[in-house]
Amino acid sequence: MVIEAIVTRLDAAFEQIEATPDSRESQQQRETILQWLDHASAEGYRLGLVTTLPAARFSALFEGQFGTASLDRFSVVVADAGQPSVDARQHPYDVALQALGVPRECAAAVASSERERREAEIYGMSRCVQIADVARAAAPLGHC
């Protein structure tokens, strides 16, 4: 099976960017995320993003740091992912994948930290990598 969609978790990067917006590390995070977004969009992947940030805070942070056009590349954004939902049995990745119309076997996860990558792996995403590795390699995620 071919990877059709990528669900992204970038909370660790967002925390760093919020805490030290002018630092070299935050600048590198922004550049890596933008490079990855450009690459994933050019490859034709459907993109979803899962974040624990509340929707208004996420929107202000993302648009302020990356621009509205970058946010528009995501087909779905699942905000408040750390809060218990009405249907607590539904994982935030389930919500994103359902909205993207892709089974987890045909989706990859890209994360900004090892903890986020492990979470996606435990959830059962077919491929789980850190954003810095994907951006450095600049290679398609390939097959499941």
Predicted regions and their residues:
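Asp-based phosphoryl-transfer active-site loop
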Residues: 1-22
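Short beta->alpha linker loops
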Residues: 28, 32, 53-54, 88, ...
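Substrate-recognition element of Asp-dependent hydrolases with the DxDx(T/V) motif
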Residues: 33-63
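Surface-exposed amphipathic alpha-helices with a cationic face
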Residues: 37-42, 97-98, 117-121
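A structural signal for isolated positions on well-ordered beta-strands in alpha/beta enzyme cores
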Residues: 46-48, 76, 108, 129
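Substrate-recognition "cap/lid" segment bordering the active-site pocket of phosphatases
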Residues: 55-108
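Acidic, Mg2+-coordinating phosphoryl-transfer loop and its flanking beta/alpha structural elements
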Residues: 104-139
